[in-house]
Amino acid sequence: MPNITVNGIDHHYRLEGPADAPVLTLAHAQGFTLDSWAAQFDHFAGRYRVLAPDLRGHGGTAMAGAAYRIEDLAADFVALLDALGIERIHYAGASLGGMAAFALALDHADRLRSVSFVTTQGILPQASIDGQRAATDVMRRDGAEARVDAILERYLRKGYREDRPDSYAELRRQFLNVPVEGYAEAGAAIFAMDFDDRIGAIDLPVMVIAGEHDIATTPERMALYRDGIPGARMDIVPNAGHMPYVEEAGAFNAILAGFIDSQPTG
């Protein structure tokens, strides 16, 4: 998979599918990498051109080395599209990637055909900020190994580790390969964001996708975006937590495909 420098940062990305097909861009969660979208590449790359980068400080993409905002992640996407000669995209972002979706939808709507918000939110409750700061402090002191299993067990449905040990091990591998400071830089950007007061201004086809058993971003929390964004649709992936695109990829793919396939191709 290639690398390209945009906005002064070396970005790692994967791009597959027919050159003349509509582009579906996938953005991963904090602490993970573009590899978390493996099942979506398998499903969509036959008829869409599928693009997924590693976000700043994750996977093969360099750290920013300084504080940044969620809006800067959106600017990275726009610069990447420009560098690759891509005009407009369907965008699906999970958690951190979904937070960037708010900035894209509000500030760069002309680059989007549609946007799918996956297990994400536009402002983090203070209790969540406090919990993540504490977890980051532990990882800075003791390494990511000290928190990886607690974080995965919060994100994944109950019993996933036992039911899908290979998948669990792959997610664990991704998390441990993200530098702690890359995770922390993303966390600082998340803590500072506040998009919820502006969601009524989003004027795009929108799908909101929740996981039935997600305790990090509950379906009830996600419903605020269905209700607050004009024309937004919502679906819930059964038997999934915070990572439905991994936990129940078949059901997730069906929901996403049903939405983006219904959009105009022009």
Give residue spans per PLM region.
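Acidic catalytic loop of the alpha/beta-hydrolase fold
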Residues: 212-217
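Gly/Ala-rich beta-loop-alpha elbow adjacent to hydrolase catalytic centers
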Residues: 93, 97, 101
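Catalytic active-site module of serine/aspartate enzymes centered on a nucleophile-bearing elbow/loop
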Residues: 232-266
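Conserved alpha/beta-hydrolase catalytic His-Asp/Glu region
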Residues: 126-130, 142-200
